[in-house]
């Protein structure tokens, strides 16, 4: 059985850990608010851009459609971009994204598809480096960026465009965590190329006839690469909000668990101390009676 001194040291150690986890929880909560605001602020622009592209795509014929929209007509070669956190202490945030991505990748490989992988985030690279060592074409470390902007997403978009234009891939899918609420982040696979145009994105209500100058095809050639970067940035912003939400929850659970341990250790300490005092009293009384 541990001595009273060891028990006191154990309690002090857990209390120190509890202070750290509580501080990390508060920091994560503050960063979550900023990240959530950034993610929500980016959505109107992304939705409006998608709506414009949907309207333009409706007037483009199959042969004249840009390659990013029409695709190659095959699905033999796939590029899978997996984006998650660069840091840990956030529960299973990164693991859930990687698990969804691996299920997709393994399914494609089982079908005989040629699969290549782009890792965004140190934790993603660490988890995918071994199982897909020969398939990783690029890795990105975003830990040095204080703020996520289009300039951060652009290099990732450039790699995707390079692989696609070089004929190395037919389909590009991005895996990330869609931020729905503080308690719900959903691992999501988003097809980037060929661009998925939702018919519901087009403006509703009475339709007007527009004459475009330059042509719809020329405008799409400019907007589609821009939309690719915007989609990646939106995913990264969702990831950041989801990461801090997961970290806040994980640190809250750790703080609560530390509190439970402190109560349990304190109870054990008090019982041991009481037993020791009782033993000493018995020895004193026994000695007095012997005299």
Swiss-Prot record:
Alphabetical list of CDD domains matching this protein: F1-ATPase_gamma (cd12151)
Purpose: Produces ATP from ADP in the presence of a proton gradient across the membrane. The gamma chain is believed to be important in regulating ATPase activity and the flow of protons through the CF(0) complex.
CC annotations in GO: plasma membrane; proton-transporting ATP synthase complex
Statement: the UniProt record of this protein carries the keyword Transport: yes
HAMAP family linked to this entry: ATP_synth_gamma_bact (MF_00815)
Gene name for this UniProt entry: atpG
Membrane topology of the entry: Peripheral membrane protein
UniProt-recorded name of the protein: ATP synthase gamma chain
Keywords: ATP synthesis, Cell inner membrane, Cell membrane, CF(1), Hydrogen ion transport, Ion transport, Membrane, Transport
Taxonomic lineage of the native organism: Bacteria, Pseudomonadati, Pseudomonadota, Alphaproteobacteria, Caulobacterales
Native source organism of the sequence: Caulobacter vibrioides (strain NA1000 / CB15N) (Caulobacter crescentus)
SUPFAM superfamilies: ATP synthase (F1-ATPase), gamma subunit (SSF52943)
GO-annotated molecular function: ATP binding; proton-transporting ATP synthase activity, rotational mechanism
């Amino acid at each position: 059985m541990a001595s009273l001194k060891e028990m006191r040291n154990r309690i002090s150690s857990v209390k120190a850990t509890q202070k750290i986890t509580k501080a990390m929880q508060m920091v994560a909560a503050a960063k979550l608010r900023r990240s959530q605001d950034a993610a929500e602020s980016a959505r109107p622009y992304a939705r409006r851009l998608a709506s414009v592209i949907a309207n333009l795509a409706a007037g483009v014929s199959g042969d004249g459609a840009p390659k990013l929209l029409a695709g190659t007509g095959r699905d033999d070669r796939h590029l899978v971009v997996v984006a998650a956190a660069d840091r840990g202490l956030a529960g299973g945030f990164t693991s859930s994204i990687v698990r969804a991505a691996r299920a997709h990748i393994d399914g494609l490989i089982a079908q005989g598809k040629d699969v290549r992988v782009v890792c965004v985030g140190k934790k993603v690279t660490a988890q995918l480096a071994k199982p897909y060592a020969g398939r990783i074409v690029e890795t990105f470390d975003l830990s040095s960026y204080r703020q996520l902007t289009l300039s951060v997403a652009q290099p990732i978009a450039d790699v995707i465009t390079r692989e696609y234009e070089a004929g190395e891939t037919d389909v590009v899918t991005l895996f990330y965590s869609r931020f729905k609420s503080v308690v719900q982040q959903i691992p999501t696979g988003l097809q980037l190329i060929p661009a998925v145009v939702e018919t519901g994105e087009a403006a509703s209500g009475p339709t007007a006839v527009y004459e475009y100058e330059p042509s719809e095809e020329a405008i799409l050639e400019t907007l589609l690469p821009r939309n690719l970067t915007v989609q990646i940035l939106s995913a990264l912003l969702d990831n950041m909000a989801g990461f801090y939400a997961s970290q806040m929850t994980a640190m809250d659970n750790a703080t609560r668990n530390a509190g439970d341990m402190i109560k349990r250790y304190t109870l054990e300490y008090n019982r041991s101390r009481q037993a020791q005092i009782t033993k000493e009293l018995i020895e004193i009384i026994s000695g007095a009676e012997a005299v």
